Amino acid sequence: MANNRLMPEGQIIEEDMDGEDQNARELDIDDDDDSELDDMRVMRLNNPQVAMLLDAPHEPPFNLHHMLGPVAMPTRPRNKRSFLTVAKPFHIQPQMCALVANGWQAVQHLQPEMRRDYFANYLYENMNSKNYPNGEGLPHHWGQF
């Protein structure tokens, strides 16, 4: 294992635990930092816009007068609403011919499993010329009612 020792010049020397400097190696930390600082100085001198951007604060300054409190604004008069314009749910009853409406009423007292057959039989028995002469009251095309 190596023991690291920091020299006053910013150099790190690695030594063995015995204190021997045979495998000593120097790493210069300040050389990299100095070269970066020199590059930055040259860039600032050559490009004043870059210098302004680098010197600018990270966030915009706060305007303290906005933070003091809300400004009292005069209230705007509210418009009065008419009860006629307020939206209300309106349930439209689907259009049905009299035969289907009567058949629907006839199956309401039945169990749900039996309603389909009873409704079909009701329509078959009651859709005749006696109840609807010349087809009056029945739909003429699909989707009429």
Swiss-Prot record:
* UniProt keyword Amino-acid biosynthesis, yes or no: no
Q: Where is this region: Disordered?
A: 1-34
Pfam families, alphabetically? Answer: SOTI
- Annotated S-S bridges: none
Keyword annotations of the record: Developmental protein, Differentiation, Spermatogenesis
InterPro entries with a match to the protein in the record? Soti
Q: Which GO terms describe its biological process?
A: sperm individualization
> From start to end residue, where is composition biased (Acidic residues)?
12-21
> What is the stated purpose of this protein?
Post-meiotically transcribed gene that has a role in late spermiogenesis; required for actin cone progression during spermatid individualization.
Q: Which family does it belong to?
A: Belongs to the male-specific scotti family.
Protein name, entry field? Male-specific protein scotti
